[in-house]
């Protein structure tokens, strides 16, 4: 073989290699999402969107109709609501006393944190509860005037990223994110890979291109296509292919994970949906609810009328052929059903009005709803009828205890994720010199008024004040939400007014 032929063959092999479609397993380590977890994630998402596999309209093969009660979305929404109902969180400069202070770094981070995170956290937490986890990824938008730089935030649901590795404490140390855009002919994929090694995070960005006909499911992350330069896609041309950030102890995104144990894959470090243990019960509830609807529909009042007793009117069909039809309005068509009746009994109609079994069906549905409340840690009466349940204040509080404990667990997990968010913002502020260096502290206030009656708690704390076990300053801070400085000034003002009133009374007594 001549030198020219050898060079020609090498060139063909090189072109073939460049044109080869790449699998994600060829680019990064295998993701740790098992097939069981993938199936569960898909099911949780379908249930949340009211697209569960057991829901269907009547067909010739199966004339029954199974409709949704909307329980998955309600469970996720209600848990997110109760977790964040009284939530307060802010970033301030650390201080040696109870008075929050500020500096330029803390003030900037807090403004972005309040605007983009706290204002959206309830909705995003709902998605995290529904699918078992949520990624919050801050990234800076650098302006030529550095003082005008801001932060943007990506919220990635549990089925939108690929976790790869965790450390022994359960903290994620490697993951990949997929971003896709399409045109009329092609699908463009950006693979963003994050990896933490020692105290350095390495972020790698690569771009791929595939024909739109070859990728039917955009959520199928396995096939990436042919690798292309990032500059081939205008939206990605400014993204750095490789970036390393040193002196960090965590990845540059926050991962919220539902705190319950994983019963789908007991060896998986991933979180599970807030209704993962109620899937079969929710299925039963939907079917029972559909039986109840069918009971009402099938038991509707109807009158069976002999055909000879009904008036017919002529009409022409689409082919111009003369036909006849019953002369009835739409309401009459719903009420009257034509049939053949033995007129020897003397009547030309029969009334169809069966007794409904609604009470037994409703009671059965209510029992299922109670079980769903139990396994999803919702307080009794959230979705069930509580007519026969707890009545006294003590019993009501006891019924809420399970929900309260679960909320506290979720709050702890959410607080950890939000602390990571602020840490990452601080890292970027230093990396890009957005603000001068400055220390910060993140505070959280989770009010427990969901389980504790405010009047009862006030009476209890006042008793502690009377017994000398709680100071007036601490009580005033709790009751009015004041700082120690504000509470001290407030009490001093009250004492001054009381002293002035006492002096006036004494002067009045002396003048008598």
Positions of predicted regions on the chain:
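Short amphipathic alpha-helical segments
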Residues: 101-105, 112-113, 117-121, 277, ...
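Flexible coil/linker segments and helix-coil junctions enriched in charged and small residues
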Residues: 92-102, 215, 311-325
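Ser/Thr- (and often Asn-) enriched beta-sheet segments in non-cytosolic proteins
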Residues: 200-202, 302-304, 443
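Short secondary-structure junctions and interdomain/linker hinges
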Residues: 14, 18, 48, 115-120, ...
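Extended, charged amphipathic alpha-helical segments
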Residues: 231-395
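Extended, regular secondary-structure scaffolds
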Residues: 126-130, 135-274
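Extended, helix-rich architectural segments
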Residues: 1-186
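C-terminal helix-loop subdomains that flank or include functional centers
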Residues: 318-347, 352, 356-512
